[in-house]
Amino acid sequence: MKRIAVICAYPKHNPGMYSVDLGLGSIVNTLEKVKVTRFNIQDNYSIKSDLYKLKYNLLYDAAQLENFDKIIIWGDFLLWLLYGKHEILSKQRKNLTYDQIFEKWSNLIFLKNRPDLQKKVIIYGTTLYGINSEQLSNNDYLSMLSELCDNAQSISFRDVFSANFISQISQNKNVSYRVDCAFHFNTDKILKNIQDSPYLCYSFGRSGCDAKLEEFAKEVANSMNLNAVNLNWLDKSGLPGLINKISVIKGSSGLITDIYHCGITGMRESVPVIGIGMGASTISSTLSDKKKEVFFTQSFANQNYIYAESILNPENKTNLIADTCLKLSNSHAHEIINSFIKKKTESDKDSLIFEILN
């Protein structure tokens, strides 16, 4: 039996993170004699629905990983300094200092000074797209990032920027760009939502102008003679809620969203997707809009990405609605996008399986 430890982000209430972690489950469930144990560094946590379940163990000491054959660092921003500084600190006990949090992050995510463990590591689907020289001026961070990546078995990032950045920081030659982990989530068990009439679904919550974006989505739907359905992607309905949202997306005629993993879900389900984000957004946090723009561009779908500023400009409104309707109706373009994504997802899955088993 091959034992696999998977280090994940803390997923509570985040449907995108559930999709990410179910993606690995869809892969390893096809493998014989492979046992997966999920860890995060914040808390013991479990959640289930009628179709799926996820269980996370608390990782509090790197020694817990010693008896595993492989260690997968899976998804999200786990290796980015801003994640360690803000995400983890915000979810820890208030009596811990930042220095204590940083040390914990260093030891449990980067496996600092543990080359024996680092050599077992497969880095998959994480991102460093916002890394910069100011962050790299933290010598401790640069040192432990280089050390982990030099020793890792393989490094696969979810965006082209991260794959390029790490190749300049690490001597490891086994570096690649692969799809977001959520693309590996096999949703065949989830049935399409069947409604009386065709509909366009939407969900917003990241770009800071939800009401205006909702108004825009409804006008697009009306122009296409479709009902408009709000997914409420970011509500706290947990794993059962995610399953329902996927069902609604599967049955829709299209999706308009400013939420990264909501857009990925639409593309995975072969639904036409319009992504929205602030063109003036800077890369200042894990929720910055630029990650959506990068994703749509590297997926040959940049024509389906709209700057929110354009929607907020009333002079653009009529033409933008008409143009968005045309983009949602361009079946040939969507077939090309879906074809590339499906081929790459399958190829990346095969590569990951090989790395797990060898």
What is each of the regions a protein language model found here?
Residues 1-358:
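Active-site anion-handling motifs in enzyme catalytic cores
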